[in-house]
Amino acid sequence: MGNYKFRISEMLPNAWFHKLKDVTKHSKPKNKASSSSSNTCSKKKPSSDSLPQHSYFSNSLVANNPPHHNSPRNSLHTKKMSKRKTLYKPSLKPLTPPPLLVSASFNKSKINDQDSSYSLFPAIETSPESFVYSFYEEDDDDEFVEFSNFKINTKNKAFTKQKVKVIDSVEKACTASKPIKKPQKSHLSVKISRDEDDNEYKAEKKYQRQVSSGRKPSAGINLKRVNSPRIQLSGTRRSTSRRSESKQDVLESFAVMKRSVDPKKDFRESMIEMIEENNIRASKDLEDLLACYLTLNPKEYHDLIIHVFEQIWLQLTKTK
């Protein structure tokens, strides 16, 4: 109750208000102009019964609603305010442009044609000067672009260059990822024809059936041993005096599969044993022996076999 304010309208009955209105009409005569203005005001004003008990007014509404009549002071005040508005200019701070590749510029004439709700930069509309913001490429295109119909031109030179670079990088990466086949080092010039390879492969299959199972396989490297270097040779390469011996060698010879911890040593011993048993001294017979070892063993040991064969070849040439 301390903050509550009593009004006269709440304390007096409604009949007293009608009497007071009649007294004011008879006692105070007014001019026609003033009476007409007062009548219009009284018509516009609602009765006290319809008014709410509490009324609140905000300063912002009063400031935003100017009076209807234009006094000379108010007209001067509005002119001063309009002049002041023209003095306020937007700050020319660097706006962060969007990350676009296509050139775009804004013109005041085009922005003013649209509504203020649609405009993206309202500060530019109210300012008296025209501010043009543009983002250019290397080509310096001056085309005006509306953001409603904004589309990126993919036919631009920058896009084509970038695509070409991406394709080149992908192709380079693919070529780098491909395994490069290293050329096999030919330590010794050995000529082997396809027919001889086929014959050697067939002979290998024949003599692998007669594998000896004397030793248990230990952990190591596979090693294949051939007891006769003349498995694939035909009878035309030999003289008639040694044809019978070659037939016996082919019948008696067989391949042995072993696992070795020191393959270099085992290859050397096997080659020396084959040369001594069969009395191999001719260069053609030695080449056939090397070809036989290369075909019966995997490619991983070809370099090692050739290296061992070169050492044996040098020893044979020195003894001669």
From Swiss-Prot:
<feature type="region of interest" description="Disordered">
    <location>
        <begin position="178"/>
        <end position="248"/>
    </location>
</feature>
<keyword id="KW-0805">Transcription regulation</keyword>
<dbReference type="InterPro" id="IPR038933">
    <property type="entry name" value="Ovate"/>
</dbReference>
<dbReference type="InterPro" id="IPR025830">
    <property type="entry name" value="DNA_bnd_dom_ovate"/>
</dbReference>
<feature type="compositionally biased region" description="Low complexity">
    <location>
        <begin position="32"/>
        <end position="41"/>
    </location>
</feature>
<protein>
    <recommendedName>
        <fullName>Transcription repressor OFP2</fullName>
    </recommendedName>
</protein>
<dbReference type="Pfam" id="PF04844">
    <property type="entry name" value="Ovate"/>
</dbReference>
<keyword id="KW-0539">Nucleus</keyword>
<dbReference type="Pfam" id="PF13724">
    <property type="entry name" value="DNA_binding_2"/>
</dbReference>
<feature type="region of interest" description="Disordered">
    <location>
        <begin position="26"/>
        <end position="94"/>
    </location>
</feature>
<comment type="function">
    <text>Transcriptional repressor that regulates multiple aspects of plant growth and development through the regulation of BEL1-LIKE (BLH) and KNOX TALE (KNAT) homeodomain transcription factors.</text>
</comment>
<feature type="compositionally biased region" description="Low complexity">
    <location>
        <begin position="64"/>
        <end position="75"/>
    </location>
</feature>
<feature type="domain" description="OVATE">
    <location>
        <begin position="256"/>
        <end position="315"/>
    </location>
</feature>
<keyword id="KW-0804">Transcription</keyword>
<dbReference type="GO" id="GO:0003677">
    <property type="term" value="F:DNA binding"/>
</dbReference>
<feature type="compositionally biased region" description="Basic residues">
    <location>
        <begin position="76"/>
        <end position="87"/>
    </location>
</feature>
<keyword id="KW-0678">Repressor</keyword>
<dbReference type="GO" id="GO:0005634">
    <property type="term" value="C:nucleus"/>
</dbReference>
<dbReference type="GO" id="GO:0045892">
    <property type="term" value="P:negative regulation of DNA-templated transcription"/>
</dbReference>
<comment type="subunit">
    <text>Interacts with BLH1, BLH2, BLH3, BLH4, BLH6, BLH10, KNAT1, KNAT3, KNAT4, KNAT5, KNAT6 and KNAT7.</text>
</comment>
<feature type="compositionally biased region" description="Polar residues">
    <location>
        <begin position="49"/>
        <end position="63"/>
    </location>
</feature>
<dbReference type="InterPro" id="IPR006458">
    <property type="entry name" value="Ovate_C"/>
</dbReference>
